[in-house]
Amino acid sequence: MSTSPSRTDKIIVVDDDARIRDLLRRYLTKEGFEVSIAEDGKALNRLLLRESADLIVLDLMMPGEDGLSICRRLRAAHDRTPIIMLTAKSEDVDRIVGLEVGADDYLGKPFNPRELLARIHAVLRRRPQPEAPGAPSSENEVVNFGPFCLDLGTRVLLKNNEEQPLTTGEFAMLKALVRHPRQPLSREKLALLARGREFEPFDRSLDVQVSRLRKLVEEDAANPRYIQTVWGVGYVFV
């Protein structure tokens, strides 16, 4: 039985394969989403000029501007719309690079639409949830470290009072770390806390997101002060 989203979330599917666009449009619409489709980066640009999206499903391999370039361009423009990238199943390097340029998650082709649906729900759950008027924030904790201030309620990271861009996936990973200070977290635990799913052996994507966070919050990412590696275990926030 379908589990519809609590409100009508808007998803844009970007893929040069008309069959995949049509399949996902019909499937995700049936699951309760509002779906728009685009065959390439130019069509996506036209869509974003007239409508917003809660999430973008973005194919990596497309003629013209590919998915990596589109993702990089959106993030450079401080567009934080969550992105799930569709990649060739055997190309681990594509998945890693996709996360490095700011994608929130990925899924290898060919895929089961139900697996994509699960990824979509997991990514959307990481968003801030609107509070009822007058209700206290369900998560108003503020974490300060060095020159940084992370507001877990608004999901804003400040450095010396200047906002630092965070993708949905990066926020989820940083939140998992700061909520467990001085507690070494295994990759399995981090995957559950930040992504809501089990860690896949040989999957380097979690390490890639940690690396992106280090570049953002560490003065020297090669010698981290806050997000340290615990060899044989995982990572710890200190």
Which ranges hold each PLM region?
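Acidic catalytic/metal-coordinating carboxylates
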Residues: 40, 66-69
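Short, Lys/Arg-enriched segments at the junction into DNA-binding effector domains
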Residues: 7-10, 122-184, 188
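Basic, amphipathic DNA-recognition helix from helix-turn-helix-like DNA-binding domains
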Residues: 72-144
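Charged docking surfaces used in two-component/phosphorelay signaling
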Residues: 22-30
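Active-site beta3 strand of CheY-like receiver
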Residues: 52-57, 62
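Short hydrophobic/Thr-rich beta-strand motif most characteristic of the beta2 strand and flanking loop
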Residues: 32-41, 47
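Positively charged, aromatic-enriched patches within helix-turn-helix-type DNA-binding elements
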Residues: 156-233
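His-Asp phosphorelay/catalytic-motif detector in bacterial-type signaling
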Residues: 7, 52-54, 78-82, 200
